[in-house]
């Protein structure tokens, strides 16, 4: 009998990896440092499923050095994985009995020139995009993007995994080591030797495997959110992305959520951005009921790191940045396929595992 597959990380990426492994007949044990699944970057993000945003982010100034051909290649790869992921997550949303995706996302710009330039970029990507207007701002309607509650999905998916036989072990100091017998998961003084491990612990992945001699170019970039109680007249508010600040406004059940990452020091920094865009709407929302900060796992070139490592039996699935919800189901499938096939790391994949990638 094959040994269980142990997954460290119970966020969207780890849960989705477990989901695909169970589909393939594997037994799964899921570890996390939080007291419950989905408590990290999956907890309060903008919940946008947005393949249109597959272009690599500029992180730590390094992505600016990518030439146009490389950026186009990375964008195409992201779009391909997003398409695969979208098909699966749509099916799983239905199977899990969750509300269907809310189709269509509006993207607003500070100037019409910026809007027109983005329309040209979307045309090159093959992304359907229509010029529009939102509260007097130049905008683009993106019919292929959508919204669904990422937190609700992770909670329901975790329940489903448990019902199908997955075992959850919550340990505040879960760690990873090596012994003469193989890989070892530690929890306090307890040690368990395991045969196959997927580390999908977001930005903590790099720290977890560093003791094994592996350096991953993964850094945590703070993401912030403010949640407001929604008035009834805002039920039909569309999901909106603000291009210049890379922030978003979404309606999730009885909440309106502002979320964003780049250039923000705290959740409160979201308010002046959206107060300038839609002052009357922000005034109507009143005081936020909850503020949240999490850390998205980002890589310098915007490309996630997925698959086998040079250590036999050790796999990683991380670095999805702002695309974690959009890519989780497809990324989980890809890594599950690697694990089931027992694929080994090869020299051609070394670039996936070193900071100079």
Predicted feature residues:
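C-terminal catalytic lobe of FAD-dependent flavoproteins
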Residues: 144, 150, 244, 280-357
């Amino acid at each position: 009998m094959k040994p269980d597959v142990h997954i460290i990380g119970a966020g969207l990426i780890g849960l989705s990896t477990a989901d695909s492994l169970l589909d393939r007949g594997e037994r799964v044990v899921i570890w996390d440092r939080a007291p419950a699944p989905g408590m990290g970057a999956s907890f309060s993000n903008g919940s946008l499923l947005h393949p249109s945003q597959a272009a690599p982010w500029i992180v730590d100034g390094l992505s600016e050095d990518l030439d146009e051909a490389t950026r186009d290649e990375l964008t195409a790869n992201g779009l391909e994985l997003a398409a695969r992921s979208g098909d699966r997550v749509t099916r799983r949303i239905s199977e899990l009995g969750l509300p269907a995706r809310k189709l269509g996302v509006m993207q607003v710009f500070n100037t019409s020139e910026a809007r027109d330039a983005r329309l040209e970029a979307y045309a090159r990507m093959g992304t359907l995009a229509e010029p529009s207007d939102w509260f007097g701002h130049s905008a683009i309607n993106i019919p292929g993007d959508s919204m669904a509650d990422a937190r609700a999905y992770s909670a329901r998916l975790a329940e489903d995994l448990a019902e199908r036989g997955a075992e959850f072990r919550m340990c505040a100091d879960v760690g990873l080591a090596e012994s003469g017998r193989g890989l070892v998961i530690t929890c306090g003084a307890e040690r368990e030797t395991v045969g196959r491990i997927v580390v999908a612990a977001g930005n903590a992945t790099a720290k977890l495997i560093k003791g094994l001699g592996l350096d991953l170019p993964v850094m945590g970039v703070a993401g912030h959110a403010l949640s407001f109680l929604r008035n009834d007249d805002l039920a039909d508010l569309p999901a909106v992305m603000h291009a210049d600040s890379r922030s978003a406004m979404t309606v999730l059940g009885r909440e309106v959520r502002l979320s964003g990452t780049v250039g923000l020091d705290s959740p409160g920094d979201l308010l002046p951005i959206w107060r300038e865009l839609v002052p009357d709407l922000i005034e109507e929302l009143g005081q936020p009921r909850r503020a949240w900060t999490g850390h998205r796992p980002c890589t310098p070139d915007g490309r996630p790191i997925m698959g086998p490592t040079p250590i036999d039996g050790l796999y990683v699935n991380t670095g999805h940045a702002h695309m974690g919800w959009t890519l989780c189901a497809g990324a989980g499938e890809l890594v599950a396929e690697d694990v089931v096939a027992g694929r080994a790391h090869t020299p051609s994949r070394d670039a996936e595992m070193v900071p100079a990638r």
